Regions:
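Hydrophobic residues within beta-strands of alpha/beta enzymes
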Residues: 133-135, 167, 198-200, 268, ...
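Auxiliary Fe-S-binding modules of radical SAM enzymes
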Residues: 1-87, 119, 123-126, 153-164, ...
Length: 333
């Protein structure tokens, strides 16, 4: 039996609201998004719809002792994504060397480098019969290349094991925020592996970085995305994510979208922050489905993104295959 890949949890995402359109990139306020009263709104309560593919994958994962972020994070979209034969894997170990206020993944000293992990992930992708695989990773500032080899080798292993399977990677910045030369050298390893989609999540506006993402820098993050666009093959799509509900203003959300577009990003996901525990960042507000639709309208129609996936339950890998298709980055076999 294949040794199981052991991922932990996925990042939780989120969204906000805005004001009347007078210029490109301005968002209409469609509903009241005042601070929440502690109760979860009805639109965040979903019904499980289990199709044949979902049942098949559930049985296979249990029989083979496999593991995915989808299960570990109790992602609400698992039924839909597995029905489309899409899943997400976390590589690089269980401990992250950075701490973000919204994230479930624990911070600590990482375990030793596991060079066999890429092969095991690829074997899992093959056994699950996936059409599209998303590979994310913890930050590994303890490694000279920030874990870039691990990401690149996972891409290569999946390509070899499952020809035609779409591959999207969501790594850290490989230390670019502190050492640009080393970060770009590491990034080039992933460039050479040619993922279909390269994602790096900015998550929140500049003002909130010191509080929410103290180990990252907003402007360096935008530079890193631009560097990825400049270095990656033209066919590779560049992607990012915004979490709203963490204290940002509506104008700041639109500003992030503008900045992302100006730095070569083609795909963006926007979803609701759901506070994992009392120890995590305080939830500021819930945003309605109508307001999420307005973010999508502004992003696609006014700012020119290839695809904006925006909704209360959206996570960064939600409908990842469809986004890749819309950006012309991947064609299903």
């Amino acid at each position: 039996m294949t040794e199981p890949v052991i991922p932990r949890a996925a990042r939780l995402l989120s969204v906000a609201s805005p004001d009347k359109v007078k210029r490109a990139g301005t968002v209409r306020r469609t509903v009241d998004t005042s601070p929440h009263d502690g109760r979860k709104p009805e639109w965040l309560k979903i019904k499980a719809r289990m199709g044949d593919n979902y049942r098949d994958l559930t049985g296979l994962v249990a029989d083979q002792g496999l593991a995915t972020v989808c299960q570990q994070a109790r992602c609400p979209n698992i039924f839909e994504c597995w029905e489309m034969r899409e899943a997400t894997f976390l590589i690089g170990g269980e401990d992250c060397t950075r701490r973000c206020g919204f994230c479930q993944i624990k911070t600590g000293k990482p375990a030793s480098y596991d060079t066999d992990e890429p092969r095991r992930v690829a074997e899992s992708v093959k056994q699950m019969g996936l059409r599209y695989a998303v590979v994310t990773m913890v930050a590994r500032d303890d490694l000279d290349d920030g874990g870039a080899w691990l990401v690149a080798e996972t891409i290569r292993q999946i390509r070899g094991a499952v020809p035609g399977c779409g591959v999207e990677v969501l790594p850290s910045d490989f230390g670019y925020g502190h050492d640009q030369v080393a970060g770009l050298t590491a990034l080039d390893q992933v460039v050479d592996a040619e993922p279909d989609v390269f994602a790096f999540n900015v998550e929140t506006p500049r003002r909130l970085y010191p509080k929410i993402r103290p180990a990252f820098d907003y402007d360096r993050s935008m530079e890193f995305l631009q560097a990825a666009r400049d270095r990656m093959p033209a066919a590779t799509a560049i992607k990012s994510n915004i979490i709203v509900g963490m204290g940002e203003t509506d104008d700041e959300v639109v500003e992030v979208l503008r900045d992302l577009r100006a730095h070569g990003v083609q795909l963006v996901t926007i979803g609701q922050y759901l506070q994992p525990s009392d120890l995590h960042l305080h939830l500021d507000r819930y945003v309605t489905p109508e307001q999420f639709a307005e973010y999508k309208r502004v992003g696609e129609q006014e700012l020119g993104f290839d695809h904006i996936e925006s909704g209360p339950m959206v996570r960064s890998s939600y409908h990842a295959g469809k986004q890749a298709i819309d950006a012309g980055a991947w064609t299903p076999p």
